[in-house]
């Protein structure tokens, strides 16, 4: 699959009620689940820091959309890896 490489809210646009992901300049094809987890960890961190008031609902909706693309099994695996990444010493836990 594709790892975006800079998955921030600045790289999403809304056009005619459809959300599009843009700016794939840092993207790469990868089969490593951890690469995808790093992408999700970044968007989660951005939601928490820049959009704290809507973080929980935004994260929930993001994961629903993610699941619709990758399937429940892969989404579950990646979310677990996000938690593992957050537990590493250099990352602060995000709600």
Set out the residue ranges of the language-model regions.
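Catalytic-loop of the protein kinase fold
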Residues: 2-9, 14
């Amino acid at each position: 699959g594709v790892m975006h490489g800079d998955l921030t809210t600045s790289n999403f646009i809304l056009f005619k009620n459809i959300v599009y992901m843009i700016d794939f300049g840092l993207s790469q094809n990868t089969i490593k689940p951890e690469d995808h987890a790093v992408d999700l960890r970044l968007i989660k961190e951005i939601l928490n820091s820049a959009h704290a008031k809507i973080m929980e609902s935004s994260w929930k909706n993001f994961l629903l959309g993610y699941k619709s693309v990758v399937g429940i099994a892969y989404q579950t695996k990646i979310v677990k890896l996000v938690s593992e990444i957050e537990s590493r010493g250099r990352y602060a836990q995000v709600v």
